[in-house]
Amino acid sequence: MKNTTNYEETRKILEDNINRLLNEKDRSMAWLSREIGTNERYIARLQRDELVPSLQVICKIAEVLRVSVADLFTKKEG
């Protein structure tokens, strides 16, 4: 059986959820980068798919946005 959730889909879900959560909280990527201890270039490179975030960074993002890591990877409908 083929796994239908491939890398590109998973990256898109993560990106969409981070953007949605930032919008809901009226926060920016600059704010997120400061809160997780990175610079804005790092976040921009993540968005352009130029690097893969470490598990440590994903956990920090979830903590700062006050969601579970699983929530970051769960596709939201609508």
What name fits each language-model region?
Residues 25-45:
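Short alpha-helical DNA-recognition segment
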Residues 42-59:
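Amphipathic, hydrophobic secondary-structure cores in small proteins
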Residues 23, 37, 48-50, 77:
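Residue-level detection of the helix-turn-helix DNA-binding "recognition helix"
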